[in-house]
Structures are given as structure tokens and as C-alpha cells.
């Protein structure tokens, strides 16, 4: 019988965690090192009303390094520290995206196997893993538009029931103002002020089901309102997924969806002759059917389609259709190669403006080596 798709995902896509090197293990304390080097060769083409831009690249694709320390107290209690780094690039100087090293995640955890765990620091939230669509690089879903994903958070996760994950997160301010005298240390304009989210996901007995709700508040731009930093006030959103594993076939079919409402605040212009910009709301939703299929041992095929629509009280409407398809193959338990392509078409209608159409095509061949 073929492996279940859940087992494939654990084995193929989380290899870095499963095969991390244990450098210390004594008296209930364990330290692990792991990560991956990942490179992609790609060709992409962007077209907006016949204005074409095309380029090819050989670049970093999410290479990372992590260290994890776990200390068991007994009776199921434990503490854990986790640090993960990534590369960032100044695109004008380093087109290969291998440049400065930055911290992606850094958090501490206190937990109990029966009662759940509390996580504090820069970490993923329940919204990160709600949707089921698979991708390596050109994912057409953007969960952060609906519910803010990873960030500075205090989170609780419960995994005491087989296949069920319950989570809740409180988001803290993400950025501080350092440029304005007298305002240093305050939350930066148009950055996250605070937020809250709750969610649940079930993946057992061939059923996948998940839902998450989040509300994120943003700092108003009250220091220099004539600067065009945006007027975002609050984003309230829902993400959900529903899927089924056909275990004998090695096939998962799923449907991801989301809805969000963004509130923009009224803003008085600095010049008295300029009219006040009124408040308005923007609504968006998407639906995305997808699949993941074990073509043969160590080879998987995956894909999904997305339809997304956005409309605002100001009269602007956007419709996007996107499709992604990919194939991956494990050359070794710690070596993964893949080819992936995506195509997206976006139509935008503004009040009193002509419709514009944008297209984006991308295809890439990648190699990941885990350690």
C-alpha cells in the first residue's frame, strides 16, 4: 500500500527537522542543529498592458540554519529555545540573494505534553499552517492578506488529541519609530500595533479541516499625514481549509478559502485647501481548489488554482486568477529536487479609469540539500 500523503509531507518537506544533527544529549537536555541550502534557477515574465519585463536568475531560495535546545523537567514538562536564520539581499547589489544573515524565528517555549505549550518571541502563528496548498516557491496564496502570519507573538498551542491542533496568538508591535524626534520608541506608523487570532486544524482519519480567525490593528500615521504611508486601520479575516486523503491512491484533494475586511481611517490633509480623505472599507475573498499526489515512491505532483476578488468603497475592483503546478523528487532522504511553475492574471477596474490587465509567469528548477 502506498504511504499516506501526511507521511510524505512529514518525510519530504520537513526533512531538516527530522534529520537535524544532535550535538548534545544528556540528562534530559538535547541540542540539535539543522537547516538546508536551497538554490533555484528560474525564468519569470511580467506583463502589464503590453509592457514586458523578463529576466532569468540563479538565486537562493529560502536557505536556512536553525538550532534547537530542549530540556525535559519530567512529568511531561519541558522548555525549548529555537533560533532560525535566513539570508536577505539588497537586490541591486546581490542578485543571487545570498547576502546578510538575518533572524527569521527566535522564541522560547514552556510546555507539557498533556496540557499544551506557551510560546514567546518571533514565531509562526496558527494562521501560518491553516491552508493545505503545497508550493516550494511561487505560492499563489498569501495568508497574510487575511490573517497576519509569523511575528512577535505570545501563543498557546494544544496538541493533546491525535490529529487536532488548537492555537491562539496575541500579536505585539512589530516595529518602533526611530526617525522622529520625541516619538522614538513609539509604534511606527502603519506597522502592526496589536492583534489576536484563534484557530483549529484537524488532520486524521483521512480528513483535513481547519479554520482560523484574526483581527490585526495598525498604527495610524499621525506624525506626518502628508507622507503617503497608507491609511490602514484594521484587518479582520478568516481562513479555512477542507480536504480528504484518498490513502490507497496517495492523493489529497483540498479547498482553501478566505475572507477579509480592511478598514481605512479618515485623514485630514496638512494643506487646508486639500480635502479630507474619507474613511473606506475594502473587502476581499478567495477560493482555491488543489491537490497533492504521490506519483511514485519519492515523487510527488501538486498544484492548485486560485480565484481572488477585491473591492472597495472607493470603487476600485480587482480580480485575480492564478494557477500553480509542480513536481518534486527525493534523490536522497536529505536531497530534494523540484520543478515548479505559476501563472497569474490580474484585472483592475478603477472608478472612472480604464481597465488594466497584468500577467505574471514564473518557472523554476530547484535543489534543496538538508543537513
Curated annotation (Swiss-Prot):
Q: What is its main location?
A: membrane
Is the Metal-binding keyword given for this protein? no
Its membrane topology is listed as: Multi-pass membrane protein
Keywords, sorted A to Z: Cell outer membrane, Ion transport, Membrane, Porin, Signal, Transmembrane, Transmembrane beta strand, Transport
Q: Which terms in the GO cellular component ontology are assigned? A: cell outer membrane; pore complex
Q: Which Pfam families match?
A: Porin_4
Q: What molecular function terms (GO) are annotated for this protein?
A: porin activity
The record's subcellular location field reads: Cell outer membrane
Per the record, what is the consequence of mutating residue 273 to T?
A: In strain: T2
Q: Which domain of life is it from?
A: Bacteria
Outcome reported for the amino acid change (mutating residue 224 to T) = In strain: T2
What's a GO biological-process term for it?
monoatomic ion transport
Q: Which family does it belong to?
A: Belongs to the Gram-negative porin family.
How does it associate, per the subunit comment?
Homotrimer.
State its role.
Answer: Forms pores that allow passive diffusion of small molecules across the outer membrane.
Q: Which PANTHER family match?
A: OUTER MEMBRANE PORIN F-RELATED, PROTEIN YDDL-RELATED
Query: Any other noteworthy remark?
Result: The sequence of strain T1 is shown here.
Protein name in the entry: Outer membrane protein P2
Organism listed in the record? Haemophilus influenzae
Q: Which gene encodes it?
A: ompP2
Amino acid at each position: 500500500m502506498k504511504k499516506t500523503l501526511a507521511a510524505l509531507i512529514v518525510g519530504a518537506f520537513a526533512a531538516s527537522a527530522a534529520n537535524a544533527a544532535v550535538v548534545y544529549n544528556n540528562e534530559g537536555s538535547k541540542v540539535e542543529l539543522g537547516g538546508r541550502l536551497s538554490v533555484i534557477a528560474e525564468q519569470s515574465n511580467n506583463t502589464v498592458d503590453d509592457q514586458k519585463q523578463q529576466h532569468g536568475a540563479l538565486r537562493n531560495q529560502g536557505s536556512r540554519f536553525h538550532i534547537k535546545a530542549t530540556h525535559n523537567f519530567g512529568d511531561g514538562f519541558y522548555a525549548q529555545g529555537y533560533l532560525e536564520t535566513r539570508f536577505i539581499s539588497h537586490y541591486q547589489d546581490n542578485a543571487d540573494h545570498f547576502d546578510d544573515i538575518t533572524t527569521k524565528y527566535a522564541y522560547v517555549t514552556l510546555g507539557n505534553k498533556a496540557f499544551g505549550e506557551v510560546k514567546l518571541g518571533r514565531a509562526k502563528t496558527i494562521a501560518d499552517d491553516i491552508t493545505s496548498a503545497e508550493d516550494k516557491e511561487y505560492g499563489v496564496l498569501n495568508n497574510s492578506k487575511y490573517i497576519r502570519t509569523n511575528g512577535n507573538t505570545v501563543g498557546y498551542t494544544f496538541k493533546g488529541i491525535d490529529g487536532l491542533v488548537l492555537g491562539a496568538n496575541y500579536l505585539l508591535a512589530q516595529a518602533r519609530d526611530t526617525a522622529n524626534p520625541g516619538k522614538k520608541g513609539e509604534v511606527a506608523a502603519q506597522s502592526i500595533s496589536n492583534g489576536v487570532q484563534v484557530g483549529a486544524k484537524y488532520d486524521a482519519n483521512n480528513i483535513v479541516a481547519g479554520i482560523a480567525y484574526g483581527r490585526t490593528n495598525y498604527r495610524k500615521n499621525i506624525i506626518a499625514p502628508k507622507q503617503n504611508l497608507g491609511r490602514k486601520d484594521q484587518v479582520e479575516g478568516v481562513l479555512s481549509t477542507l480536504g480528504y486523503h484518498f490513502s490507497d491512491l496517495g492523493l489529497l484533494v483540498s479547498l482553501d478559502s478566505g475572507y477579509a475586511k480592511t478598514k481605512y481611517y479618515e485623514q485630514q490633509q496638512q494643506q487646508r485647501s486639500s480635502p479630507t480623505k474619507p474613511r473606506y472599507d475594502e473587502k476581499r475573498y478567495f477560493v482555491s481548489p488543489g491537490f497533492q499526489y504521490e506519483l511514485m515512491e519519492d515523487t510527488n505532483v501538486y498544484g492548485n488554482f486560485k480565484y481572488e476578488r477585491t473591492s472597495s468603497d472607493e470603487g476600485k475592483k480587482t480580480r485575480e486568477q492564478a494557477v500553480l503546478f509542480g513536481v518534486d523528487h527525493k534523490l536522497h532522504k536529505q536531497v530534494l529536487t523540484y520543478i515548479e511553475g505559476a501563472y497569474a492574471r490580474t484585472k483592475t477596474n478603477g472608478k472612472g479609469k480604464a481597465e488594466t490587465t497584468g500577467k505574471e509567469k514564473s518557472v523554476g528548477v530547484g535543489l534543496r540539500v538538508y543537513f
